[in-house]
């Protein structure tokens, strides 16, 4: 048969079909997909001249000597960790994780957690204390052969993850598994248009609760599992720390109908002149210039374009993506100058920190503007002259009418950092002196917020609030609502609601004007975090809470200074919107996180932070007929350098008609993240008790469903069956119920609870899981390679993780417990003097003070290793998240101050405590309910 014209490749002779073409069908000339050349194929001829100019761009690309979608397969087997996925011929299992004492099975080397430790380290003082038994987990997991064809799976379909049942009661959970990657996403061969290992979205940007999607809503309902995405569009505070590919030629190809962006999962047709949308199937023209490098004036190799090789890309947006010129970065600081702010040292520390961070505030385009309003019972505005003016002194204007605070000349109140740099420094030096003798206890912060809204409303920007008082006069004034008698009762939930409707309605006004609010709260008394946190919640901001903060304690001052400096340096996005599109049949139904839901599917962010994650629930509205679905997140934003950009994240997932596939590919940490957001919503809507009950009911429902549908209804030998990839879920649910934000207790101050709820609904997934189930390391007997750099990577090696139970604590031990916000260094009551000497520099434990502190830098190997472990445990960047938080370290003695000890012990979520059950009781309760 003669080759078709135009140099188009002949149909396959080996029986492999181009995707989208029925088996054995003759090639449909204009509608057959076009594939990239095989890896390493030489580029074919340059542009053909003399024809129409429109096609000169594309002339180079499509004369390959090999069949469409030839053996390279469109997907590398076992692609890179960034987002590649294997496409193996055999059923792909998600193998059970090896436990101590279990016959070895290959597993990622980095997770060799739970190995028996050597005899090194600090041993017990005498024979009286047997070393803790690390594990009695010996049962080999049943590696079930699924035998033949999976029910509900089409013959010849790609084999998805295999289901490995495990008995939850027979072996304790290896907590290192909480850091494991999710079950792999297994796509059919040739699912993507290029064989790039980064063609599918990395789990650090987007995680799905289900890595195999049910084709029908009835199957999803039958599974009782949630279908949701956990989205973290930015994974670092600064672009340089985690760069993504940038498409800067302003050629953005989008589907005419559904407005999806071209991505690695589209199909090219008509000799590459058109592309078929993988969301809605519409055929679109490839834009002019798609294969042309305008800068170099030469043809481009289409298959090298970032948007066809990378699931995460950023497009530089042309003019039509702007309603107005890109917004400059604006920070208006509302600083509390009342008596409590001055006496705790907040005013002085904040002023000094802003001054020392001026060089870190993004200002590449030299348009960044700053303003300052000081707040007590009046509002104090400051005009700062330009550098080089006759007078460098700032002038202050005091406004006492809080009902209608008029604005002095706005132009002088919001000044350009570049033009007024020196005079801003002079002002910040003087600010503290202006109020050092104040006795004013009033706080008109609500009125200050309104004034700030008026001031920056025309341009938008950040209102950064630093306050150590409860707003008690003017707009939005709040009262002391906390009543210790109602803590732990059903009435407590009302204290978690806002105490003044001003904060919600004002937040919505801010969102409309592209104003975002961040709250830094420092009170040693009740401050009504529940009300104040509404401002960040609806404006894309965050609430940072520093209870009992005082600058006289260097630990407090240094923690805030580091965090606030990183906050100011963060390369936030401005005037942003987020939208998630998906394959026909799927719909985004509910959105969770700090933003304003402007329409059914559009989330508005006056500022887009870099240290938060969002959860989007997905509904299946109609039967999905495709073998692969795609979900594409787009964030349109202005960078803080004044460039309009669109960050696009495309996730492709296989579909299935089999319930076993759905369970085998479910991601336990993404599911826990989804239910964390649901629990916060339930708490604020219905109450704490209802939120806890809903969590318990949900885990019972999942266990019962699995037993009934997939375990044949059996409860063998008193066990409790669940898939091995979900075996941490009952523990995570218990830990969530016992978290500071949700647990039943009469001891938790309302502000602490409200601040915890803010974290539970904003933290990126790795930090949220750690906040729910903290990390504990045994330091006194850590292996020799722990606390020192790994020779291969240079990264500090952490000791093996321990389960959070007092059974793991030996009386002579030293342990680090870290929930990502706070670190506890637990010193056992019988710690040997040498250990205390090496770590703390005291010959006797009685001299060791407890409470927040920095570890001394001592000249011995063990002290260095302990400090390295503490530091590495704070290294969020290596875990693919941006965060300004520097966890505070508390030294706790087992026989020391009871309040501190109880706080540290509340992290041991597997123990019975306060009004919470132990893990053992919890598992017995679940089993009882499941077999009822």
From Swiss-Prot:
Q: Where does the chain cross the membrane? A: none
Q: Which domain of life is it from?
A: Eukaryota
Chain spans, region Disordered? 1-58, 81-109
Note the topology in the membrane: Peripheral membrane protein
Which stretches does the entry tag as region Zinc finger-like? Answer: 255-280
InterPro entries in alphabetical order:
ADF-H/Gelsolin-like_dom_sf, Gelsolin-like_dom, Gelsolin-like_dom_sf, Sec23/24_helical_dom, Sec23/24_helical_dom_sf, Sec23/24_trunk_dom, Sec23_24_beta_S, SEC23_SEC24_subfamily
Q: Which Gene3D superfamilies match?
A: beta-sandwich domain of Sec23/24, Sec23/Sec24 helical domain, Severin, von Willebrand factor, type A domain, Zn-finger domain of Sec23/24
Q: Name one GO cellular component term.
A: endoplasmic reticulum membrane
Q: Where is the composition biased (Low complexity)?
A: 15-28
Checking Pfam families in the record gives: Gelsolin, Sec23_BS, Sec23_helical, Sec23_trunk, zf-Sec23_Sec24
Would I find Ribonucleoprotein among this entry's keywords?
no
Q: Name one GO biological process term.
A: COPII-coated vesicle cargo loading
Sorted alphabetically, the keyword list is: Cytoplasm, Cytoplasmic vesicle, Endoplasmic reticulum, ER-Golgi transport, Golgi apparatus, Membrane, Metal-binding, Protein transport, Transport, Zinc
Annotated residues that bind Zn(2+) are located at 255, 258, 277, 280
What are the disulphide bonds in this sequence? none
Q: Does the keyword Transport apply?
A: yes
Location within or outside the cell: Cytoplasm; Cytoplasmic vesicle, COPII-coated vesicle membrane; Endoplasmic reticulum membrane; Golgi apparatus membrane
**Biased composition, class Pro residues, residue ranges:** 86-106
The record's GO molecular-function terms, alphabetically, read: SNARE binding; zinc ion binding
Q: What does this protein do?
A: Component of the coat protein complex II (COPII) which promotes the formation of transport vesicles from the endoplasmic reticulum (ER). The coat has two main functions, the physical deformation of the endoplasmic reticulum membrane into vesicles and the selection of cargo molecules.
Task: Summarize the subunit comment.
Answer: The COPII coat is composed of at least 5 proteins: the SEC23/24 complex, the SEC13/31 complex, and the protein SAR1. Golgi apparatus membrane; Peripheral membrane protein; Cytoplasmic side.
Concerning its family, UniProt says: Belongs to the SEC23/SEC24 family. SEC24 subfamily.
Which protein is depicted? Protein transport protein SEC24
